[in-house]
Amino acid sequence: MKLKKHVAVLLISFLCLIGLVTQHAWSSNGLPRIDNKTLAKLSLQHPVVVLFRHAERCDRSSNECLSDKTGITVKGANDARSLGKELTTDIKKYDLYASDTVRTIQSATWFATDKKVTVDKKFQQCGKAIYSAINDVQIRSPDKNIIIFTHNHCLSYIAKDKRDVKFSPDYLDGLVMHVENGKLFLDGEFVRY
């Protein structure tokens, strides 16, 4: 009887441990969580595409505007810069893109002050069109990591379409993807630690 109790306790402990590990490996929305170190490892296997929602919008905040009312706040600019410093610690080489709105261009510019931002209006088209925009960029830069600043509805669409999950990104939340044999795969949600 004691042996059965010990086995039961061990089994329950093991299941609890699995639950804790799973909680840290998966987001509450069902997407795998990909931190900076994991992203760096993925980028060694194949070039990655990281899509970020723009930083805090000026027109939806009481925080001080960076400049234009259609752009981002000073806080948003500082948050984008902080994210850029964290991410580029491990991912040194990448091309940087933004949709053609002030808020995405400012977010990308503050993310990496030393990089040229390529503006492409196609990153504002959400739905299946976002995939052709990503593929076009991937074709132009086949062996490079790509970072794109876009919009929450684009990220929500990708998560729903690729993984059938609801994803409601906050400012500067991101998704990690890669292209394999011409097909786009959603690897998971980028998380900051």
Curated annotation (Swiss-Prot):
Residues 1-25 form the signal peptide. GO terms for molecular function: phosphatase activity. It is an enzyme of class 3 (hydrolase). GO terms for cellular component: periplasmic space. The keyword Hydrolase applies. It is found in: Periplasm. GO terms for biological process: lipopolysaccharide metabolic process. Pathway: Bacterial outer membrane biogenesis; lipopolysaccharide metabolism. Keywords: Hydrolase, Periplasm, Signal. InterPro entries: His_PPase_superfam, LipoPS_heptP_Pase. Its EC number is 3.1.3.-. Belongs to the phosphoglycerate mutase family. Ais subfamily. Catalyzes the dephosphorylation of heptose(II) of the outer membrane lipopolysaccharide core. This is Lipopolysaccharide core heptose(II)-phosphate phosphatase. It comes from Escherichia fergusonii (strain ATCC 35469 / DSM 13698 / CCUG 18766 / IAM 14443 / JCM 21226 / LMG 7866 / NBRC 102419 / NCTC 12128 / CDC 0568-73). The lineage of its organism: Bacteria, Pseudomonadati, Pseudomonadota, Gammaproteobacteria, Enterobacterales. The gene is ais.
